[in-house]
């Protein structure tokens, strides 16, 4: 049975189910190409701004229609572990596919936006729209991109999908709206009378119309309150240069330096989400790679807490030489092993760190340095991360300065569950407002 005349009809029907979002701080994000005509109708009905999230499926080389994952803007990568195992793909084969698709992703992003800035998502509801869901790899990547860009809430809205769509997107979308979930679902096109391909030119035309006709009604100006500084930077940390991203808003109240966990980088989706929230609250942020690519190849370096802490100390010293950050009080936000490094660095007399926040951290890796931490410290742990919770409880008993342990109910180690990372960001923001902006710790 055909449920929709075409993508426009599907979008109008979908908009009716999303009517409760009217008047809220919404950005509608279409997945090109087929999702954009649907998203246009949703944005038009909600009088919300329309943008695209460009993602590319990663197809198995000998069976391209079977996706083993997807990539999105800003380095987001999602893998389907079952497909990878079942097809016996190795890293070299996957990397070759990803390199090719990355070129196409960049081309499309430039073509579709035509020089316009990405619409900011910080503090907004991101409504991600496609013409339907098949494997879901593309939409999952899109959800992660939206969250990385600071969306307060991620809603996935599609006209048609499998009957287990809600379960599939647990941990990716906060809410899933799907008009039809046929018991015998085999393809997105089965719900449409007209399912002809959408061209690049049509995508551009829809975005142009939305920008002209109703973007202003959404009251979101991409150029409003631009950061004073928002750029990739090269930092000399000891004997090596490391890559970072520095964001400084107007009249910053302090700066938070992020220390990522093992196997991560300055592109960490979760850290970038927290950083966007902090920037929105008036804090400058620096996300940087604790190790060079060459150093990362030696796995021992990843867990060399003294080395990682020395990088934090060096970077903190570098910030003191930058005109935009020299006078700002400094805080650390550490995740996993990065939290251990942050606590070691905070205990070092060469730096004046005013506050520390740990997300799913390993403070036990800080060893004897815990006994010298006087900066107010917030330890955030998931309620279902039992082993790490016990490690943090022991660390709290050792840290002599103010130390608070907060448990996020229902969260596992990575805070992937809907709403849990948002709680982390709010807790961190409140902690830095209370402790980074006031007088420093005594001792």
Curated annotation (Swiss-Prot):
GO terms for molecular function: hydrolase activity; transferase activity. One of its GO terms (cellular component) is cytosol. InterPro entries: AB_hydrolase_fold, Dienelactn_hydro, Hydrolase/PRTase-associated, PRibTrfase_dom, PRTase-like. CDD domains: PRTases_typeI. Keywords: Transferase. The keyword Ribosomal protein does not apply. Induction: A member of the dormancy regulon. Induced in response to reduced oxygen tension (hypoxia), low levels of nitric oxide (NO) and carbon monoxide (CO). It is hoped that this regulon will give insight into the latent, or dormant phase of infection. In the N-terminal section; belongs to the purine/pyrimidine phosphoribosyltransferase family. PANTHER family: ESTERASE, PUTATIVE (AFU_ORTHOLOGUE AFUA_1G05850)-RELATED. This is Putative phosphoribosyl transferase Rv0571c. It comes from Mycobacterium tuberculosis (strain ATCC 25618 / H37Rv).
């Amino acid at each position: 049975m055909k449920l929709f005349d075409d993508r426009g009809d599907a979008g109008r029907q979908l908009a009716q189910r999303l009517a409760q979002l009217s008047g809220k701080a919404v950005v509608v994000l279409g997945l090109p190409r087929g999702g954009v005509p649907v998203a246009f109708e949703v944005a038009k009905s909600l009088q919300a701004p329309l943008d695209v999230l460009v993602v590319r499926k990663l197809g198995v080389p000998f069976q391209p229609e079977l996706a083993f994952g997807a990539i999105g803007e800003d380095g987001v990568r999602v893998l389907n572990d079952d497909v990878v195992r079942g097809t016996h793909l190795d890293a070299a084969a996957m990397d070759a596919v990803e390199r090719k698709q990355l070129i196409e992703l960049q081309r499309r992003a430039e073509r579709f936006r035509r020089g316009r800035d990405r619409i900011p998502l910080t503090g907004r509801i991101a409504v991600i729209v496609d013409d339907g869901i098949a494997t879901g790899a593309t939409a999952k990547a899109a959800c992660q991109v939206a969250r990385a860009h600071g969306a307060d809430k991620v809603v996935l809205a599609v006209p048609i999908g499998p009957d287990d769509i809600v379960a599939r997107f647990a941990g990716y979308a906060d809410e899933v709206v799907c008009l039809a979930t046929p018991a015998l679902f085999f393809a997105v096109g089965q719900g449409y009378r007209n399912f002809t391909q959408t061209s690049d030119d049509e995508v551009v035309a829809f975005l142009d119309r939305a920008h002209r006709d109703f973007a202003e009604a959404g009251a979101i100006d991409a150029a409003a309150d631009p950061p004073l500084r928002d750029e990739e930077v090269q930092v000399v940390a000891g004997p090596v240069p490391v890559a970072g991203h520095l964001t400084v808003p107007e009249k910053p109240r302090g700066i938070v330096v992020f220390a990522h966990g093992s196997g991560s980088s300055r592109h960490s989706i979760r850290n970038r989400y927290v950083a966007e929230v902090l920037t929105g609250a008036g804090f400058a942020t620096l996300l940087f790679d604790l190790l060079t690519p060459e150093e990362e190849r030696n796995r021992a370096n990843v867990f060399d807490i003294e080395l990682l802490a020395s990088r934090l100390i060096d970077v903190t010293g570098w910030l003191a030489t930058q005109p935009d950050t020299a006078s700002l009080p400094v805080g650390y936000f550490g995740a996993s092993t990065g939290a251990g490094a942050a606590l070691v660095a905070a205990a070092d007399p060469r730096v004046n760190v005013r506050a520390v926040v740990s997300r799913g951290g390993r403070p036990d890796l800080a060893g004897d340095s815990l006994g010298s931490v006087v900066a107010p410290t917030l330890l955030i742990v998931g309620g279902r991360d039992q082993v790490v919770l016990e490690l943090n409880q022991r660390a709290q008993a050792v840290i002599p300065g103010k130390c608070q342990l907060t448990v996020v109910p229902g969260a596992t180690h990575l805070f992937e569950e809907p709403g849990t990372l948002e709680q982390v960001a709010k807790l961190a923001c409140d902690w830095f407002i209370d402790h980074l902006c006031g007088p420093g710790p005594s001792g």
